[in-house]
């Protein structure tokens, strides 16, 4: 479902976290307006309904639904602005049908800007945690006032994110690489540090956190570039002493030399076919450059086991708070440098990990196995996940933002960016489906595999994550990689394949891939029947073995052929249908030219009615607006004005046309003297309004006279 243009935060955002209400639907924003989109399930699949705009502010950075703790009580919606939060109470009117009543119950201002996920609701009570970079506070009476209690933050680090445990007794705040735990006492309304472990360091800078169990949280840590670049930096760049021989064994900033040389020979032999996507280390290149020079200015030496510390990858870590704090799981996140999105499904015990700056989503499942597996969901090259959540245990719901092409030579100057948003769902492949696909790799296009050797210490010290299907991927090896550069590689000789992939429809832009651990296979097929290879716009999967080679198969798999032929057949059928419509129009024109009048039009079939969507903007109060959307049947491409007036209770009707509003009139037959096409979107309002109306939903620019909440003046 297309949502339109929006201006959202660039990083650290999960727009679908606490954003779905069972009655009111999905709450989302375009940066200024508060929108509700109805959501319902049909045979386990999500279906999206109408979208209504219920409010407008100067800035909206996030929307969060409160918990369903009291049956019959109005829903609570927290609206996050730049430096303050407003809490609204929403309920359907008992007097008027389809009328939503919105009342502000609480407002809280902060001296510092709020975090990207600056509001976190308690799972069982009307208690809201508000987060800035310096402070964490809890509002415990949001339906009445803004009374709150602050957490006693120890240390000088910056807060990045926080979450409540599922039992609601603990607020866990992520500061740098440490988890600060606070116990919440609802009777005393107090927030005190944990008695047995107030601070727990996970060993990496925390990007996202989510509760997974009654006393367990999952955290995602980013790739520690500062530690990698700073670790042994002095040793790596020190000039050798006279007492030191150049042959003295020392550490290096690179991966295994044999591994790099094999990769280099492989790249040299296959350079004409494609570019290498393996790890290339600058220090190794410099050390082997200019062999004729016996004394380079900087002596670069090899480190033997830098990666043995496990600091060469971003990680997903499960932390349990019981009588002591323990790390129960730890697994690497391949290909995602800054994993700032986590979504957890408590039914299937499945975790989805993504990043606002990477076009793929990884899905893990929590089990006690030493051979975990991950499913990868790949987006288009210019798409980014802005929100991820589970609709069911096998269905993921995404809010995807498509970016405009930015010049990579210039760093972004703002923490926000413009996107074109859409909602989509993707079913995960479990059990038999996953097993069947992993048995025959040659019959599936785009399946990627990678493996790595595991030391005994790694197997004993790290428990990993696995999909329910049983196919798995292990944690990072201690000796095979340092930093893996994820890049695009154009394997197909078809020059326009990347462009064609970018122009693919949004329905087919999300692809699902499986990783398993037998051996490494990478396939790329040529474009068949108008469908180009998607590998040209995808990041390459990591490489860890010295014997791995990249190759392309010019013959597409059978399943891919059948799928492409079926898609081509559907496209041809649509073209033939358009030709039939053109022929009918030409026949009518010819008849009109010969007889001087148009032939009597035949009504369309009841199975294919011709209609338009009419959205009526109504003002509920001074600052609250609502949209009522109805489909209306067309009569030969025309609309009866009297029906529109009675349907929406209007006397004089205005219709939006570009930047202006046009008052509608009727001809002698009572129809608006305009013709409309099937499924046109029309926006109307009453011409007799007392105050300036807000702009229509989805408008790019908001005029200065647009009404704003009084709280926005602060």
UniProtKB/Swiss-Prot annotation:
Keyword Disulfide bond set for record: no
Keywords, sorted A to Z: Coiled coil, Repeat, WD repeat
Region (Disordered): 432-454, 531-564, 685-714
GO MF annotation: an example: kinase binding
A Pfam match: WDCP
Cross-referenced InterPro entries: WDCP
SUPFAM superfamilies, alphabetized: Putative isomerase YbhE (SSF101908)
Positions in coiled-coil regions: 567-595
WD repeat residue numbers: 55-98, 154-194
Name of this chain's protein: WD repeat and coiled-coil-containing protein
UniProt organism field: Danio rerio (Zebrafish)
Gene name in the database record: wdcp
